[in-house]
């Protein structure tokens, strides 16, 4: 028996001889073994395995995607090339209006019973119209509204309703005859569609003494 030889990768290779004895491989056998080993090492690099094909969706996990668009849609949403809808900074909506004088209601106010305001404190998005004192929703979402209507030097009980598209949603009352100023106050969360309208209406009593210091406020909690 001949002494064992070393093949590729440092392995000892023995080959059978004429009478069943083991012999070392020849030079050609060693070259063939080295070539096979190199081929096995290079095969993964030459033929990579594709995890996804081009038709599979791209999944982003734990990544922050920033989408910039100079012309967002009317509802403040931007759609990226990946089909992802992203709300832009212009989607913020909030308003707050107040009454700064005690002027008596105009003829229009007496006819429609709309409670008007004459000063805007906040109007982000410009969706509150001061002239009509009506807020128009720019998009579907959940909105928060609150109001405080002060009756001044008026002994009549008043009822103030928050109107959504012409229908009363909530009301508040003020009727204490022993105070010179009293407020009818309330607040609510509303589900609104795009272009829904909200305003305040005097359902009962009058504001002939004025309603200075009254406020009407609202903002978008989140879009849907």
From Swiss-Prot:
GO terms for biological process: maintenance of synapse structure; positive regulation of synapse assembly; spontaneous synaptic transmission; synapse assembly; synapse organization; trans-synaptic signaling, modulating synaptic transmission. Its main location: secreted. The keyword Glycoprotein applies. Glycans are attached at residues 53, 110. It is found in: Secreted. Residues 88-224 form the C1q domain. Transmembrane segments: none annotated. Acts as a synaptic organizer in specific subsets of neurons in the brain. Essential for long-term maintenance but not establishment of excitatory synapses. Functions as part of a trans-synaptic complex by binding to postsynaptic GRID1 and presynaptic neurexins. This interaction helps regulate the activity of NMDA and AMPA receptors at hippocampal synapses without affecting synapse formation. NRXN1B-CBLN2-GRID1 complex transduce presynaptic signals into postsynaptic NMDAR response. NRXN3B-CBLN2-GRID1 complex transduce presynaptic signals into postsynaptic AMPAR response. Homohexamer; disulfide-linked homotrimers. The trimers are assembled via the globular C1q domains. The trimers associate via N-terminal cysteine residues to form disulfide-linked hexamers. May form homooligomers or heterooligomers with CBLN1 and CBLN3 prior to secretion. Once secreted, does not interact with other CBLN family members. Interacts with GRID2, and more weakly with GRID1. Interacts with NRXN1 and NRXN2 long and short isoforms produced by alternative promoter usage. Weakly interacts with NRXN3 short isoform and not at all with NRXN3 long isoform. This is Cerebellin-2. It comes from Homo sapiens (Human). The lineage of its organism: Eukaryota, Metazoa, Chordata, Craniata, Vertebrata. The gene is CBLN2.
């Amino acid at each position: 028996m001949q002494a064992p030889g070393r093949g590729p990768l440092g392995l000892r290779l023995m080959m059978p001889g004429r009478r069943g004895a083991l012999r070392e491989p020849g030079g050609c056998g060693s070259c063939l073994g080295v070539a096979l080993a190199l081929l096995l090492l290079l095969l993964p690099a030459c033929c990579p395995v594709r995890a996804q094909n081009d038709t599979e969706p791209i999944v982003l996990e734990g990544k922050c995607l920033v989408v910039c668009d100079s012309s967002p849609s009317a509802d403040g949403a931007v759609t990226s090339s990946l089909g992802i809808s992203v709300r832009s900074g212009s989607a913020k909506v909030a308003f707050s209006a107040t009454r700064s004088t005690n002027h008596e209601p105009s003829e229009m106010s007496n006819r429609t019973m709309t409670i008007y305001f004459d000063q805007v404190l906040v109007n982000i998005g410009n969706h509150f119209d001061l002239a009509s004192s009506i807020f128009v929703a720019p998009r579907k979402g959940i909105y928060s509204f609150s109001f405080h209507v002060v009756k001044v030097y008026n002994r009549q009980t008043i009822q103030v309703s928050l109107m959504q598209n012409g229908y009363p949603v909530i009301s508040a009352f003020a009727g204490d005859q022993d105070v010179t100023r009293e407020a009818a106050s309330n607040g609510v969360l509303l589900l609104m569609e795009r272009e829904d309208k909200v305003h305040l209406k005097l359902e009962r009593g009058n504001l002939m003494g004025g309603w200075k210091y009254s406020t009407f406020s609202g903002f978008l909690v989140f879009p849907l």
